[in-house]
């Protein structure tokens, strides 16, 4: 009988905790209007931010293309501020 009582108390405590957690989650989640305003404020929606991301991607790709065109293994370069031909980067 004692084991059944402890099991019921444990189930009640866990169920109560889950109930409180569910209620708090429902209170914290934003409503539909707040979700829409948050989506409008995201950085990806800003055209300047998108242009900057495109430019950064272009620069990375150009750098990778230049690195692929050389015979130097840049992974073994000791001084990263100096390019393979001795010039400063």
Curated annotation (Swiss-Prot):
Entry keyword Secreted: no
A GO biological-process term: mitochondrial electron transport, ubiquinol to cytochrome c
Domain of life, per lineage: Eukaryota
Mitochondrial intermembrane side: 29-89
Keywords: ATP synthesis, Membrane, Mitochondrion, Mitochondrion inner membrane, Transmembrane, Transmembrane helix
KW Transmembrane helix (keyword) present: yes
GO molecular function, one term: phosphatidic acid binding
Broad class of where this protein is predominantly found: mitochondrion
Record-annotated membrane-spanning stretches: 8-28
Summary of subunit composition and partner proteins: Associates with the ubiquinol-cytochrome c reductase complex (mitochondrial respiratory chain complex III(CIII) or cytochrome b-c1 complex). Interacts with UQCC1. Forms a complex, named COMC, composed of UQCC1, UQCC2; UQCC3 and UQCC4; mediates MT-CYB hemylation and association with the first nuclear-encoded complex III subunit UQCRQ.
Function: Required for the assembly of the ubiquinol-cytochrome c reductase complex (mitochondrial respiratory chain complex III or cytochrome b-c1 complex), mediating cytochrome b recruitment and probably stabilization within the complex. Thereby, plays an important role in ATP production by mitochondria. Cardiolipin-binding protein, it may also control the cardiolipin composition of mitochondria membranes and their morphology.
Record's protein name: Ubiquinol-cytochrome-c reductase complex assembly factor 3
Origin species: Mus musculus (Mouse)
């Amino acid at each position: 009988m004692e084991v059944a009582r402890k099991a019921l108390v444990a189930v009640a405590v866990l169920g109560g905790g889950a109930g409180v957690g569910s209620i708090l989650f429902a209170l914290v989640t934003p409503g539909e209007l707040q979700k829409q305003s948050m989506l409008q404020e995201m950085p990806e929606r800003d055209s300047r931010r998108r242009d900057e991301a495109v430019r950064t991607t272009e620069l990375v790709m150009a750098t990778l293309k230049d690195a692929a065109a050389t015979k130097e293994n840049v992974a073994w370069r000791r001084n990263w501020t100096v390019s393979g031909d001795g010039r400063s980067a």
